[in-house]
């Protein structure tokens, strides 16, 4: 069974738990959680991830800055990124995708939609 390493970046403990719980349905999943973009960058420096899932609106460093920094880092620029933000935050969605995010999931999160997007990305990665 292949192993899939996910980095979940979300400042809300409840949302982090919900996303992580959904990802655990994928066989071989290993989930690491981060509270904000700075915490995520620290974890990226010591671990390898298959997909980053990040909220956009967070304190300290938001998800858009995180997407930009990951895309400009040669060691991590190819890691797929899924941005998660409040439904209707069209400007955030557009900016996130323009910065290099691979996909977008609106809040409130529908588990089936999240898993479909994650599985599509994993299939493309091979």
Regions of interest found by a model, annotated:
Residues 33-51:
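Acidic, metal-coordinating helix/loop segments flanking the phosphotransfer/catalytic sites
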Residues 53-55:
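Active-site T/S-Asp motif of two-component receiver
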Residues 58:
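Receiver (REC) domain active-site loop signature in two-component systems and cognate sites
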Residues 109-118:
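C-terminal output helix
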Residues 13-32:
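Two-component/phosphorelay signaling modules centered on CheY-like receiver
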